[in-house]
Amino acid sequence: MFRTEKTVEFDKWIRKLKDIRAKAKILFRIQKLETDEHFGDCKPVGDGIRELRINYAKGYRVYFKEKDDKIIVLLIGGEKSSQQKDIKKAKEIWKKINKD
């Protein structure tokens, strides 16, 4: 079983998400990740960071990194349209976490 940690940036993003159905689908995928260790539609985006793809509406993405084999750090979320910017931001957040 995985345990997740959320960054402030991820928490802000998910709270601001107005599409309730999208939010439910995203949270369900995270729950599946925690309980079943099932990543589903997921791909690497560089520096060990991976993109969890939720194929609904705007094509939501959750960027995360595994830590200590059983902890998933949820870095940030976004949409397909902001994918490159979000990947860059996820990498910056991870570097900041590792610095502290």
Tell me the role of every PLM-derived stretch.
Residues 3-4, 12, 23, 38, ...:
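Enriched for short, Lys/Arg-rich terminal
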Residues 3-31:
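Solvent-exposed, charged helical/coil patches
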Residues 28-56:
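A short, surface-exposed loop/turn module that caps and links secondary-structure elements
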